Structures are given as C-alpha cells and as structure tokens.
C-alpha cells in the first residue's frame, strides 16, 4: 500500500517539470538576438549629445541592475540595416571568433561610458554621439546580430 502512494505523485511531478521546461522561455527568457536589440538598438532616435541620454537609456534598458555596465553602444539606424551587416565584410571578432561582420558604411551611434568614480547604484555615463562603422557578431537562422563587438572610424 505504501508503494501505491509513492507511484501517484511521480507522474504528476514529471508533468509539472515538463510544463515548467516548456514555459521557461516564455517566462522572461530572452534570445541573444532579442538581448542585442534591447541593449544596442535605438532606431527611433538620432544620436544624442544630451548628457542625460546614456543615464536614461542604460537604466531604461535594464543595464544598471545589480551593477553598472562599463561601456555600451546604441545604434540609431533601422533594425534591417543593422541585420544586413551580417552579410557584409567578414572580420575577426575581438575574442578571436570568426562570426563578426563590419558595416560597409558608417552608422549613427551613441557610445556610453561609465564615468570615473561612478559606482552602483548611482551609475553615471558619459554620452558620445559618433558616426562609425560597426562590427557585430552574428548567429542563428535567420542569421542576425547577437553581440556588438566594436565600432571603428574607417573601413580599413
């Protein structure tokens, strides 16, 4: 009789674990492509020289929760133009991987750098609007940007 009591919860446990496994991605898990867009895309605006742009955007895009991200770049171009970089000039990533691509043309970006002495929870950023070639790492099917690797002044 004790055996019967232990057998009933096991299938229930299996069902619960399966449901949690299927539901997990929809419970806030974000793909690398979605994370790239959240952290780097700001298509609806122009590069800003406003000293508050980076402070506001870094907080709004959840990059100051628990710590201050030291550097981040926002791209002010249509998403499709940034996605098309994945089919442009292939370059080696800073970490040595070979899935990086450099934009053929310069793009409008804003670079955010943590100011000296700034510490969590009071993250303060210097805002620098620029026009540069961007380098992104691409993966997946469809092939899309998943990591902002760098920006460079010229195309060489």
Curated annotation (Swiss-Prot):
Glycans are attached at residues 62, 116. GO terms for molecular function: lyase activity; nucleic acid binding; ribonuclease A activity. Its EC number is 4.6.1.18. The active site is at residues 40, 147. Residues 1-28 form the signal peptide. InterPro entries: RNaseA (IPR001427), RNaseA-like_dom_sf (IPR036816), RNaseA_AS (IPR023411), RNaseA_domain (IPR023412). It catalyses: an [RNA] containing cytidine + H2O = an [RNA]-3'-cytidine-3'-phosphate + a 5'-hydroxy-ribonucleotide-3'-[RNA]; an [RNA] containing uridine + H2O = an [RNA]-3'-uridine-3'-phosphate + a 5'-hydroxy-ribonucleotide-3'-[RNA]. It is an enzyme of class 4 (lyase). Disulfide bonds join 54-112, 68-123, 86-138, 93-100. It is found in: Secreted. GO terms for cellular component: extracellular region. It comes from the Eukaryota. One of its GO terms (biological process) is defense response to Gram-positive bacterium. Endonuclease that catalyzes the cleavage of RNA on the 3' side of pyrimidine nucleotides. Compared to RNASE1 it has lost activity towards dsRNA. Belongs to the pancreatic ribonuclease family. Monomer. This is Ribonuclease 1B pancreatic. It comes from Pygathrix nemaeus (Red-shanked douc langur). The gene is RNASE1B.
């Amino acid at each position: 009789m004790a055996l019967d009591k232990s057998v009933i919860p096991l299938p229930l446990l299996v069902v619960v674990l399966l449901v949690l496994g299927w539901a997990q991605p929809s419970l806030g898990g974000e793909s690398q492509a979605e994370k790239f867009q959240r952290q780097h895309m700001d298509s609806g605006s122009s590069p800003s020289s406003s000293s508050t742009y980076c402070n506001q955007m870094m907080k709004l895009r959840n990059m100051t929760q628990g710590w201050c991200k030291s550097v981040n770049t926002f791209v002010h171009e249509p998403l499709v133009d940034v996605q098309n970089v994945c089919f442009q000039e292939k370059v080696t990533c800073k970490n040595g991987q070979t899935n990086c691509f450099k934009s053929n043309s310069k793009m409008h970006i804003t670079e955010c750098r943590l100011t000296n002495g700034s510490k969590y929870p009071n993250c303060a950023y210097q805002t620098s609007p620029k026009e540069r070639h961007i380098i992104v790492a691409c993966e997946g099917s469809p092939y899309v940007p998943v990591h902002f690797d760098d920006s460079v002044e010229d195309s060489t």
